[in-house]
Curated annotation (Swiss-Prot):
Organism: Helicobacter pylori (strain J99 / ATCC 700824)
Name of protein: Acyl-CoA thioesterase YbgC
Pfam families: 4HBT
Assembly and interaction partners: Homotetramer. May interact with CagA.
Domain of life (superkingdom): Bacteria
CDD domains documented for this protein: 4HBT
NCBIfam families the record matches: YbgC/FadM family acyl-CoA thioesterase
Classification via InterPro entries: 4-hydroxybenzoyl-CoA_TE, HB-CoA_thioesterase_AS, HotDog_dom_sf, Thioestr_dom, YbgC/YbaW
Functional note: Thioesterase that may be involved in phospholipid metabolism. Displays acyl-CoA thioesterase activity with lauroyl-CoA (C12:0), myristoyl-CoA (C14:0), palmitoyl-CoA (C16:0), stearoyl-CoA (C18:0) and benzoyl-CoA, catalyzing the hydrolysis of the thioester bond. Has low activity with butyryl-CoA and octanoyl-CoA.
Active site residues of this protein: D11
PROSITE patterns, per the entry: 4HBCOA_THIOESTERASE
Family: Belongs to the 4-hydroxybenzoyl-CoA thioesterase family.
Listed transmembrane segments: none
GO BP annotation list: lipid metabolic process
Amino acid sequence: MRCRVYYEDTDSEGVVYHANYLKYCERARSEFFFKQNVLPENEEGVFVIRSIKADFFTPASLGQVLEIRTQIKELRKVFVVLFQEIYCIQNASLEPMKPFKVFASEIKFGFVNRSTYSPIAIPKLFKELLSAV
């Protein structure tokens, strides 16, 4: 998924506010499901974040175009671990440039029952979709 950095994404230094990288990653994960005409939840359960490891490299800034790349690191019965990286692929000037990494994260999601929040098996449909990443 690609997105552009807007004023609302930046801090007082003019670079992307650190928490927004997590928002970009969440949007990419959601967009993955939306493109399959599926919500990332069902009547029985929902994905919840168990843990996040985040690494910040070079800050992105206003007008740059970012590309969020997602890989499955581990897919188990009740959880999935995703590795997501964000690259700057275009400057605001629109001139050609070599992409560079700005952020990387490893996020562990559990699938839990909506009412009890107890872990339950990831539904077959979700496992099939995630396996295709």
